[in-house]
Amino acid sequence: MKTIEVKVERTISAPPGEVFDAWLDSKTPGTPWNIGNKVLLNPKVDGLFYLKGKSVPHYGRFTEMERPARMQHTWVSPNTLGEESTVTVTFKKHGDDTLMTLVHTGIPDTEAGRGHEKGWKYFLDIFPEQFGNGPRKEK
């Protein structure tokens, strides 16, 4: 099966550690953990997550956790046809700010799979607002 990759970058007005921690907080608007009515989140290596959003459930397992620079987890939903895909998020110091880069690989090249780009951009347009600034879109 052919797969695609989604990459979204944002510059956020806060240091990497603060951005990293906020991204893993289910109370922070603009994170994938802050959707729907049911969230189970265990953000550590081999920790699992389950999200029941408005339309479809998502689940996965954290495979890397290197605070404050990088995290990686699997991502499974009906939109990935039940197959594991991989989400890697990096947080790099960029002057006084943080360059946050999200790369989602292994997404099926289907209409539902291609919808992940819109979804991640939605989150990463809201998330920077928690730090007192709107998004500054790079890609």
Show which residues each predicted segment covers.
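Conserved catalytic core of Hanks-type protein kinase domains
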Residues: 22-23, 65
